[in-house]
């Protein structure tokens, strides 16, 4: 195990179909694997604020689809938008909903949170957002510590007017957000430093 504060042990379960079949049909048998590996910070620089870009041309999932399922088919389409964002100097992409193109859904493969007037906001689970374990843990931890948490539709406009923001996931843990850019508009948080509530939850 990595020393406390310097890394984590990442556990990744993998289930894949196998057997003598080539067509599009359920596999007759399955293989279950578990990868275990020590890891460092998901984003370069460790627990430092990251800059994100809102994608206005790509969507991670659509209503009625499998966006709420942890499957490779939900990650592969995001590789191109992520690569484009990184080539422009951003750490990752923020995806908006495919229906109204106004509400934040996810940050690459991480869940999104923002803080306004001491209240913690996160996009509600609508079937297009992955119900992350870290997301669930943070919501419970925040409420246990007397922090109000609201699960709702979070518009990009609202998020960009928030006091602080961060994303979270099994690999990302908690990554503070320093700025969000949408088109020609850029919102900055805490002068590039992790916010008070973000730090407390971390």
What kind of region is each of these model predictions?
Residues 1, 14-17, 21-202:
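Helix-start/capping segments and mature chain N-termini
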């Amino acid at each position: 195990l990595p020393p406390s504060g310097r890394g984590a042990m990442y556990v990744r379960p993998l289930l894949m179909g196998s057997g003598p079949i080539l067509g599009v049909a359920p596999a007759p048998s399955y293989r279950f694997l578990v990868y275990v590996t020590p890891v460092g910070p998901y984003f370069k620089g460790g627990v430092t604020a990251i800059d994100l870009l809102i994608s206005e041309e790509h969507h991670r999932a659509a209503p009625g689809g499998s966006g709420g399922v942890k499957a490779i088919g939900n990650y592969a389409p995001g590789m191109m938008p992520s690569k484009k964002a990184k080539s422009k100097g951003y750490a990752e992409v923020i995806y908006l909903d495919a229906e109204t193109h106004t509400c934040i859904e996810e940050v690459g493969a991480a869940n999104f949170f923002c803080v306004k007037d001491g209240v913690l906001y996160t996009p509600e689970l609508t079937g297009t957002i992955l119900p992350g374990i870290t997301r669930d843990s943070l919501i419970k931890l925040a409420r246990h510590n007397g922090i109000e948490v609201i699960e709702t539709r979070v518009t990009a406009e609202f998020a960009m007017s928030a006091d602080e923001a961060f994303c979270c996931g099994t690999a990302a843990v908690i990554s503070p957000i320093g700025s969000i850019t949408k088109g020609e508009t850029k919102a900055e948080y805490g002068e590039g430093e992790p916010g008070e509530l973000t730090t407390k939850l971390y």
